[in-house]
C-alpha cells in the first residue's frame, strides 16, 4: 500500500495533481461541483457573530471558501471565509452521516462550499456553525500560497490580486474605503446640484494637462488617437453650452513614470462650476476630503507615511510666494527681473528645466517644486501659481504674472489642483502658442493647440471655477497605504518573461 503523504508535505505539482484526481473522481461519481448553478444562503459570518444572542440555535445557510481544516477523525473544525469575514464550522460524522463525512474529508483548503447548519458556541466559547449538510460548489485545483498563512510578496500580491484578497482579507478594506469615498464624493457634489457626465476617453488631441499621452490607432477612421490625460477641455465645453455645474469621475491615462504615488492609469474627479472661482473650489476640496474622513473613519485624524495628519476643516492657505519665502528664504515679491529671479534660485541650488524659459515665474515654481513641497505635511492650499505653469488659468487681477490657481498638499503629496478658469479666448490662444513653442523645444508634456476648444470659448464662457482631485491618493490617505498599488485593484505591472 502506498504511504499516505499529507498534502502540506507534497511538492506543489503533486498537490495540483492530487486535486485534479479528486475532481476526476467526483465527476466519475456524478458529483461534478462545476455543475452547481446556485446556492441559496440566508446568513454570513459577520451577521452570525454580531447577532449571536438572537441567532443561537437557529438554522442558517451560508457559503464561502474553506481556509483551514483541523482534526480528521470523526470531528473536523474548519474556517469558512465569506465576503464578510470568517467563521468556524463544526463538522461531525454523526451529523453528516458516514458517507457524506468521508466525502467532506477529501475536500481541500481553498474549496468553495455551501453549508446548512445550526449556530452555537463551542466549549471554548467560539461562535460556530454545527454543519448538517456541506455541498461542494467549486473545486480549487491550485493550493493557496505559503501554507495559507498569508501572501507577503508584493509582486505576487499585485499580479494576482484574487489570491491576495483570498488569503489577506484585510486588503479588501482598502477597496471598501475606496468605494465609500467615491460614494461620499458623488453624494457631496450631487447635493450641490452638480450633474455627473461622461466625456470621451479617445481624443484626436490630448489636452487639459501637462503629460505625455498614450497613442492608439482607430482602424476605421485610419487616424491616431490619444487616450485622455484629463477631462478638463470637454467639461469646459459643457460650461460654455450652459451646463453650469458638471463633474466626471473617470480613468485618466498618462504615459509616464511609475512610483509609489503614480500609476499610468488612475482615477480622478474633475468638476466645473460657472460663476465660481478658485476660492469656492478650495471650500469644496476641503469639504470632500475632511468630510469623507469623518464619515468613513469617524475621525479627522489619520496616519500616513509615518506622519499624523489632522484633516479637520480650516486648512492652511498660503501663496506660492509666501511658501518660497518661508521655506527657501527668497522673497520673489521683491524681485521683478527675470535674470535676478533665476540667479536667486540658482544661489539656493535650484536649476530650471532645460526646456523652460528663464523667467521669474519659472524660477518661482522651480524653487517651490524642488525645495518647498517636502515641508508640506499638514493640509495646505498653495495658491497663486505663475502663469508659465498654468496655461488654462485666469490671471490674477493684482499681479498678471500669477494665476488664480491652487494645489492642495497633504504629507508632501498633491491631492487636488484647481483654478479660476481662463475664459478669455485671446489670452488662451496666446498661452497655447507658448505651449506649442515648448513642445518644439522638446517638452513633450506641453499642451497641444486645441482649435475647437478655442472656438467654443469664443462663443462666451462664464467665469468658472474648476478642480481635479486624485481619487487614488485620497484613498491612500484614508487607508494609510504607502503605495498607490495598494489602492488600485489591478495596478499596471510589467509582464513576466
List each language-model region with its residue ranges.
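Class II aminoacyl-tRNA synthetase catalytic cores and aaRS-like
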Residues: 1-497
Amino acid at each position: 500500500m502506498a504511504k499516505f503523504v499529507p498534502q502540506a508535505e507534497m511538492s506543489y505539482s503533486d498537490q495540483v495533481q492530487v486535486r485534479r484526481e479528486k475532481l476526476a473522481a467526483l465527476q466519475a461519481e456524478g458529483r461534478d461541483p462545476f455543475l452547481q448553478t446556485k446556492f441559496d444562503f440566508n446568513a454570513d459570518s459577520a451577521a452570525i457573530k454580531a447577532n449571536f444572542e438572537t441567532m443561537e440555535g437557529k438554522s442558517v445557510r451560508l457559503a464561502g471558501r474553506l481556509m483551514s481544516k483541523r482534526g480528521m477523525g470523526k470531528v473536523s473544525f474548519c474556517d469558512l471565509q465569506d465576503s464578510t469575514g470568517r467563521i468556524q464550522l463544526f463538522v461531525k460524522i454523526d451529523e453528516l452521516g458516514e458517507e457524506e463525512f468521508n466525502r467532506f474529508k477529501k475536500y481541500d483548503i481553498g474549496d468553495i462550499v455551501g453549508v446548512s447548519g445550526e449556530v452555537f458556541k463551542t466549549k471554548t466559547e467560539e461562535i460556530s456553525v454545527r454543519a448538517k449538510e456541506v455541498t461542494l460548489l467549486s473545486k480549487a485545483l491550485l493550493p493557496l500560497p505559503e501554507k495559507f498563512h498569508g501572501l507577503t510578496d508584493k509582486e505576487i500580491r499585485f499580479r494576482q490580486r484574487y489570491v491576495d484578497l483570498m488569503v489577506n482579507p484585510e486588503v479588501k478594506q482598502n477597496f471598501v474605503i475606496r468605494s465609500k469615498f467615491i460614494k461620499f464624493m458623488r453624494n457631496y457634489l450631487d447635493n450641490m446640484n452638480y450633474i455627473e457626465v461622461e466625456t470621451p476617453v479617445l481624443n484626436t488631441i490630448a489636452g487639459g494637462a501637462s503629460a505625455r499621452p498614450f497613442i492608439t490607432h482607430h482602424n476605421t477612421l485610419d487616424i491616431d488617437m490619444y487616450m485622455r490625460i484629463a477631462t478638463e477641455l470637454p467639461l469646459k465645453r459643457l460650461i460654455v453650452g450652459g451646463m453650469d455645474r458638471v463633474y466626471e469621475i473617470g480613468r485618466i491615462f498618462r504615459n509616464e513614470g511609475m512610483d509609489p504615488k503614480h500609476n499610468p492609469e488612475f482615477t480622478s474627479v474633475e468638476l466645473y462650476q460657472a460663476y465660481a472661482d478658485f476660492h469656492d473650489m478650495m471650500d469644496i476640496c476641503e469639504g470632500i476630503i475632511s468630510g469623507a474622513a469623518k464619515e468613513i473613519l469617524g475621525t479627522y485624524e489619520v496616519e500616513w507615511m509615518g506622519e499624523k495628519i489632522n484633516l479637520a476643516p480650516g486648512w492652511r492657505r498660503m501663496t506660492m510666494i509666501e511658501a518660497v519665502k518661508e521655506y527657501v528664504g527668497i522673497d520673489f515679491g521683491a524681485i521683478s527681473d527675470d535674470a535676478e529671479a533665476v540667479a536667486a534660485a540658482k544661489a539656493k541650488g535650484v536649476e530650471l528645466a532645460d526646456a523652460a524659459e528663464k523667467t521669474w515665474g519659472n524660477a518661482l515654481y522651480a524653487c517651490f517644486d524642488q525645495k518647498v513641497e517636502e515641508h508640506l505635511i499638514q493640509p495646505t492650499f498653495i495658491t497663486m501659481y505663475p502663469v508659465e505653469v498654468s496655461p488654462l488659468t485666469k490671471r490674477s487681477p493684482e499681479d498678471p504674472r500669477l494665476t488664480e490657481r491652487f494645489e492642495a498638499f497633504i504629507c508632501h503629496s498633491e491631492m487636488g489642483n484647481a483654478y479660476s478658469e481662463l475664459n478669455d479666448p485671446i489670452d488662451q490662444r496666446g498661452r497655447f502658442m507658448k505651449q506649442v513653442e515648448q513642445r518644439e523645444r522638446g517638452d513633450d508634456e506641453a499642451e497641444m493647440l486645441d482649435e475647437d476648444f478655442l472656438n467654443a470659448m469664443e462663443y462666451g464662457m462664464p467665469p468658472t471655477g474648476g478642480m481635479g482631485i486624485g481619487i487614488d491618493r485620497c484613498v491612500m490617505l484614508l487607508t494609510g497605504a504607502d503605495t498607490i498599488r495598494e489602492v488600485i485593484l489591478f495596478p499596471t505591472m510589467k509582464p513576466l518573461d
